[in-house]
Amino acid sequence: MIERTIETATKRYPLLLGDGAARVLPSLLRSLSCPPGTKLFIVTDDTVAPLYLDEVRALLAAAEYDVYAYVIPSGEAAKSFDHYYACQTAALQCGLDRRSVIIALGGGVVGDLAGFVAATYMRGIRYIQMPTTLLAHDSAVGGKVAINHPLGKNMIGAFHQPEAVVYDTSFLRTLPERELRSGFAEVIKHALIRDRRFYDWLRAEIKTLADLRGEKLAYCIEKGIDIKASVVREDEKETGVRAHLNFGHTLGHALESELGYGALTHGEAVAVGMLFAVFVSERFYGRSFAEHRLADWFAGYGFPVSLPTTVQTPRLLEKMKGDKKAYAGTVRMVLLCEIGDVEVVELEDDNLLTWLDEFARQGGKG
């Protein structure tokens, strides 16, 4: 099992990664001063619950913890105020107190919602991230928790670091191909923004999604977490370089919001967003990334590589202006200087709209 210590300006906590990592939960809880009898509140979704909830609950009950569970619908639409409020209500009805621990058993949606519940329940209680998807290798580390608003994604949230991340990779065996693809988008993102050697390894070793198995999958997760952790160590509250992790997310979040959450997976939207960011980078910096054939590379995994024909670019621009990186209505995007190096740049509306229209016509191959 791989062990890491995640360090931020306000907290240090362990990350445990490997097949069977869930088995360490009882000893981990004891190390966190959670004696038997402590109330534990597992938040999961209706996809994960039939697969792993009973297993995790039995493990904790055998260690004499007082275990409760709350199941939300799967999918991005669950990151709503209604589901957040219902989860808070369930926690109150179960009698959770300030010594209780919430366990987020699921993907990014579960982690975001459960983490935000933990951040705000009784002004903040402890929680543990237990990712069950590849996508959550990114969201489980760093303490950003949130719910969505109809006007934008992750607009209501907090920075609330977990007590630990327990990443049992055996849970990934039941992951559908589309969800595996979605998570791989964030792996690609980490390579593009921070690590040219990892990018080259991905191009050479992960030819298809079928290659995301065994040691190669574990290496992708380990590298992605290490890159995310290094950024969070430098900038916990996203006042500087942590914004680089939003590469592809300015347009990606706009697409998710405009199309309705669930029409595209998060990774599919981010993939289109990354290709658009490269498209803009070429025009902003006057250089070409054509030799990398990024759109062809993405398409080889089954990612969409162009805007859906149903979207209107002026509406996308308005959504992008609501992005959390924007200042005074000015869009700020993470652009690619070269493979492994990015920066945040302010862009004028007229230029962005022109580039959105051009990208809509040409796709990522422009």
Curated annotation (Swiss-Prot):
Binds 1 divalent metal cation per subunit. Can use either Co(2+) or Zn(2+). Signal peptide: none annotated. One of its GO terms (cellular component) is cytoplasm. GO terms for biological process: amino acid biosynthetic process; aromatic amino acid family biosynthetic process; chorismate biosynthetic process. SUPFAM superfamilies: Dehydroquinate synthase-like (SSF56796). Its cofactor is Co(2+); Zn(2+); NAD(+). Pathway: Metabolic intermediate biosynthesis; chorismate biosynthesis; chorismate from D-erythrose 4-phosphate and phosphoenolpyruvate: step 2/7. It is found in: Cytoplasm. The keyword Metal-binding applies. GO terms for molecular function: 3-dehydroquinate synthase activity; metal ion binding; nucleotide binding. Its EC number is 4.2.3.4. InterPro entries: Dehydroquinate_synthase, DHQ_synth_AroB, DHQ_synth_fam, DHQS/DOIS_N, DHQS_C. It catalyses: 7-phospho-2-dehydro-3-deoxy-D-arabino-heptonate = 3-dehydroquinate + phosphate. Zn(2+) binds at residues 186, 249, 266. Gene3D superfamilies: 3.40.50.1970, Dehydroquinate synthase-like - alpha domain. NAD(+) binds at residues 74-79, 108-112, 132-133, 144, 153, 171-174. Keywords: Amino-acid biosynthesis, Aromatic amino acid biosynthesis, Cobalt, Cytoplasm, Lyase, Metal-binding, NAD, Nucleotide-binding, Zinc. Catalyzes the conversion of 3-deoxy-D-arabino-heptulosonate 7-phosphate (DAHP) to dehydroquinate (DHQ). HAMAP family: DHQ_synthase. Belongs to the sugar phosphate cyclases superfamily. Dehydroquinate synthase family. This is 3-dehydroquinate synthase.
